[in-house]
Amino acid sequence: MLLGKDNQAIGEQTVAVILIDLVNDNDEILPSVYEDAVFYNAHSINAFYSESSYQQTWLEGDVFGWYHVSNSNACSLLDSEVFDIADADINYLDYSRYIIIFRNNPQCGGVGTSTFGKITVNTPDGEIIASIARIYTDSIYIPYDSSLTMQSTIAHEFGHSLGITGHANAYDCGSVTLTNEVQ
């Protein structure tokens, strides 16, 4: 449940988006595209959570990277490795939510994982309480007009970061999504 005045999912969410390129083909999309997709455009993750929460939750933050990692066989890195790579650019005490996007090879596939709410995280700047969403993609495309895009995966995993633990698990609602009766 996300209600209550002490809920950490209410109010401004300070977000650092960290872009990690494990492919290194110089074909990644511009960080500004991620900035717009997460924070600024009409279909942004910020707009989604702001509207869904009746303007009680909103995102503020920055995008960092691309950081190029030479191990092209890797599908991801440990969080501590990511924090070390981006340390020169980020003061980890300034953010309480992290979205790490790994651009990897096609054999790695694309999914996401996340903490459920905030956890204790060790960073080069010290111990913080933060959430971490990790997105694994072999795509350089981040459209926002389809429910099956990387942006919807980011929004989904960020929901877990806020503490949303449930899944519909592909529940078929039939022809009615909301009803007073079980179908």
Residue ranges and their predicted role:
Residues 1-182:
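Active-site-proximal segment of zinc-dependent metalloprotease catalytic domains
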